[in-house]
A protein has these predicted regions:
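Hydrophobic alpha-helical transmembrane segments of membrane proteins
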Residues: 1-76, 87-252
């Protein structure tokens, strides 16, 4: 499975390089604006980082889905399913690499954001006092350790939620491409399947939340324990269903 993961990791190498170069340019531009005291330069680079973060995280997530669609569509890419490896190994490698890819890009943006934040505090010294006051207020309300734990918890829940979205995308593609392999409408069917599956998952979540409201008690966090448990279960269920369908339709 390690070789399969390396193979899948290489498929998105170009995208990662573009993101890394773009981030480096934005951060250097921002820090350059700090050094020469150019507010416009700092503002433009910060805006590009902010807007780009939404696009990049979204694209890097769906790119793995597009690659899976290509692997099931073109004859050359379809050959990966004819290797001696089991469908479970191939699909597992794709899932793991997709998750690692998202985490990698997320980590890059966190590092870039921290560098810009430190540079901004150096440039506007008095602003540091404002952030210190805000931080102290949060600490007084929840305690320093709890504040850090809440931030980590919320970020992890967001990561799990986005992972579930990508996995549902995988399932939608597998459903369309295994049933309508040679159909020109398979792409459109996969989009419809994605929204239908997502709608069903969210409906079930809402029903559970109404029946068991206590599982959604989140304290000072945005996400409750029920949210995390539910979507982890969904991720596992979607993987098993995707693997079962692929094994039935693609194994040789």
């Amino acid at each position: 499975m390690g070789k399969l993961m390396k193979y899948e990791w290489k498929k998105q190498r170009t995208s990662r390089m573009i993101v890394m170069v773009a981030l480096a340019v934005c951060v250097l531009t921002f820090l350059g604006g700090v050094m020469v005291e150019k507010d416009a330069l700092m503002g433009v680079s910060a805006m590009l980082l902010l807007v780009g973060s939404f696009f990049v995280v979204f694209y890097m997530g769906i790119e793995s889905i597009l690659i899976l669609n290509r692997d099931l569509k073109t004859k050359q890419s379809y050959m990966i399913w004819m290797t001696p490896k089991s469908v479970w190994e191939i699909l597992g490698a794709k899932f793991v690499v997709a998750i690692v890819q998202m985490f990698f890009v997320f980590a890059l943006y966190v590092i870039a954001g921290l560098l810009c934040f430190v540079g901004m505090l150096q440039y506007v010294g008095e602003l540091g006092n404002v952030f210190a006051i805000i931080r102290d207020s949060f600490i007084q309300l929840s305690g320093e350790g709890q504040l850090i734990a809440q931030i980590i918890w919320n970020l992890f829940c967001i990561f799990v939620g986005w992972t579930e979205v990508v996995m549902v995308g995988y399932l939608a593609v597998i459903v369309s491409r295994t049933i309508l392999r040679d159909s020109k409408y398979a792409g459109g069917i996969s989009i419809v399947a994605f929204f239908v599956i997502t709608f069903i998952i969210e409906k079930i979540y809402n029903l559970i939340s109404n029946v068991l409201p206590n599982v959604e008690v989140a304290g000072n966090s945005f996400f409750g324990v029920g949210y995390l448990v539910y979507y982890i279960i969904i991720c596992v269920a979607v993987f098993l269903l995707s693997g079962w369908m692929a094994d039935k339709k693609l194994s040789v």
